[in-house]
Amino acid sequence: MEQAPENQGPAKEPFNEWALELLEELKAEAVRHFPRPWLHALGQYIYETYGDTWVGVMAIIRILQQLLFTHYRIGCQHSRIGINPRGRGRRNGSSRS
């Protein structure tokens, strides 16, 4: 009869530690791009809606990821991935392959 392989790899970081580290990184990035009162209001909304639960942690992670992605995409001046309607980087209409 077949047996499951033994756990031979390095110990994986528990999900909750990973989620809290990710949340801290997202918060640090968000305060560089959004007003603190907005972020405080978002935190209050999440706390009032979900309380102090893992569902709340995952909700705020998802919202911060979406906010930051959208912010970068529509043209954060600190980002290189924004949409630029003026076609920055082109000279005289020529494009390089």
UniProtKB/Swiss-Prot annotation:
Query: Which InterPro entries does the entry link to?
Result: RetroV_VpR/X
- Span list, region Homooligomerization: 1-42
Instruction: Indicate where this protein resides in the cell.
Output: Virion; Host nucleus; Host extracellular space
Q: Which residues carry this modification: Phosphoserine?
A: S79, S95, S97
The principal location of this protein is virion
Q: Biological process (GO) annotations?
A: DNA-templated transcription; monoatomic ion transmembrane transport; protein homooligomerization; regulation of DNA-templated transcription; symbiont entry into host cell; symbiont-mediated activation of host apoptosis; symbiont-mediated arrest of host cell cycle during G2/M transition; viral penetration into host nucleus
Tell me the Gene3D superfamilies matching this sequence: 6.10.210.10, VpR/VpX protein, C-terminal domain
The known PTMs are summarized as:
Phosphorylated on several residues by host. These phosphorylations regulate VPR activity for the nuclear import of the HIV-1 pre-integration complex.
Which terms in the GO cellular component ontology are assigned? host cell; host cell nucleus; host extracellular space; virion component
**Please, what other remarks does the record include?**
HIV-1 lineages are divided in three main groups, M (for Major), O (for Outlier), and N (for New, or Non-M, Non-O). The vast majority of strains found worldwide belong to the group M. Group O seems to be endemic to and largely confined to Cameroon and neighboring countries in West Central Africa, where these viruses represent a small minority of HIV-1 strains. The group N is represented by a limited number of isolates from Cameroonian persons. The group M is further subdivided in 9 clades or subtypes (A to D, F to H, J and K).
Protein role:
During virus replication, may deplete host UNG protein, and incude G2-M cell cycle arrest. Acts by targeting specific host proteins for degradation by the 26S proteasome, through association with the cellular CUL4A-DDB1 E3 ligase complex by direct interaction with host VPRPB/DCAF-1. Cell cycle arrest reportedly occurs within hours of infection and is not blocked by antiviral agents, suggesting that it is initiated by the VPR carried into the virion. Additionally, VPR induces apoptosis in a cell cycle dependent manner suggesting that these two effects are mechanistically linked. During virus entry, plays a role in the transport of the viral pre-integration (PIC) complex to the host nucleus. This function is crucial for viral infection of non-dividing macrophages. May act directly at the nuclear pore complex, by binding nucleoporins phenylalanine-glycine (FG)-repeat regions.
Q: Which HAMAP family match?
A: HIV_VPR (MF_04080)
Q: Which family does it belong to?
A: Belongs to the HIV-1 VPR protein family.
Subunit structure, interactors included: Homooligomer, may form homodimer. Interacts with p6-gag region of the Pr55 Gag precursor protein through a (Leu-X-X)4 motif near the C-terminus of the P6gag protein. Interacts with host UNG. May interact with host RAD23A/HHR23A. Interacts with host VPRBP/DCAF1, leading to hijack the CUL4A-RBX1-DDB1-DCAF1/VPRBP complex, mediating ubiquitination of host proteins such as TERT and ZGPAT and arrest of the cell cycle in G2 phase.
> What protein name is recorded for this chain?
Protein Vpr
Recorded source organism is Human immunodeficiency virus type 1 group O (isolate ANT70) (HIV-1)
Gene designation per UniProt: vpr
